[in-house]
Swiss-Prot record:
Subcellular locations according to the entry: Cytoplasm
HAMAP family: GTPase_Obg
Coiled coil regions in record: none
UniProt source species: Acidovorax ebreus (strain TPSY) (Diaphorobacter sp. (strain TPSY))
This protein's name: GTPase Obg
Alphabetically ordered keywords of this record: Cytoplasm, GTP-binding, Hydrolase, Magnesium, Metal-binding, Nucleotide-binding
Main location: cytoplasm
Chain sites annotated for binding Mg(2+): S173, T193
Recorded name of the encoding gene: obg
Known function: An essential GTPase which binds GTP, GDP and possibly (p)ppGpp with moderate affinity, with high nucleotide exchange rates and a fairly low GTP hydrolysis rate. Plays a role in control of the cell cycle, stress response, ribosome biogenesis and in those bacteria that undergo differentiation, in morphogenesis control.
Amino acid sequence: MKFVDEAFIDVAAGDGGNGCVSFRHEKYKEFGGPDGGDGGRGGHVFAVADPNLNTLVDFRYSRRHEAKRGEHGKGSDMFGAAGSDITLKMPVGTIISDADTGEVLFELLTPGEVITIAKGGDGGFGNMRFKSAINRAPRQKTPGWPGERRNLKLELKVLADVGLLGMPNAGKSTFIAAVSNARPKIADYPFTTLHPNLGVVRVGPEQSFVVADIPGLIEGASEGAGLGHQFLRHLQRTRLLLHVVDLAPFDEAVDPVAQAKAIVGELKKYDAGLYEKPRWLVLNKLDMVPSEERAARVKDFVKRFKWKGPVFEISALTREGCEPLVQSIFQHVHAQQLAQNAPAEVDPRFAGEPPRG
């Protein structure tokens, strides 16, 4: 499922160091020649395509990125040291454009690709550069050149890692709002979500995953009833499905187990591959169940639903149980990413041989 994630950043490469005016001071030499060194270049700003990242969420927390300026030149023919470079890690597929003009400047298409997005300024010349037969004691120097400064827009077509599956009003939108930066429309009537909502869940620095809230399914969705059919296909590219169930429906005549079975039935009818995808059961709205009844109600649901996979009990409204679920999701998604990016095993007998045409 593709969505566009975007972020705006300001980058500034380092200015070059200034040149130095200096003269040699040696014993018995009253007029030593010029020995002022050049300034060091400013630090560059690089971007590298990191296959372990899948969102731009970190750039929303740190917008400005500056490299160090170069050191000034010194006497005794000493040049200033170059300023330290900085490297920004971005997901593969990031498009970098000028935020002011909209012009596309760079695209990070291959893992490990490195590009220079802002070049550091050159260092200024020291007075030793201006010595000539006519001018034996020059006092000229030049300042360092300014580094490049850019306002950039980052765009990434994002594939959702996790899809939320469930009946209308199961609490999917509330869950995505509780754990991510998404703010879906939420109300107490079915089909509040009319379009897929994307949320980026940030677990830590450079640790995040993408969750998609799909409009609620009803029985008959695989044949195109309700809003289900056009969105079921969005779940096919996800790494994990969360089956969200309302454990305390307002209408007491509604059986959560029957609803859950209907969802699984639609999934199986629509696509066997989707049915076989890793799926976790998330029992929501625990805050609506008296604490003394919770264990019995969960046990009864799991038994009648004949469920043998992972079960998580949460209240999206109060966020109870959400943190352990988020951590488990990240570990699962990260493990799948590592497996997907692992290099293919090479038969040791043929290691180092060129590929045969």
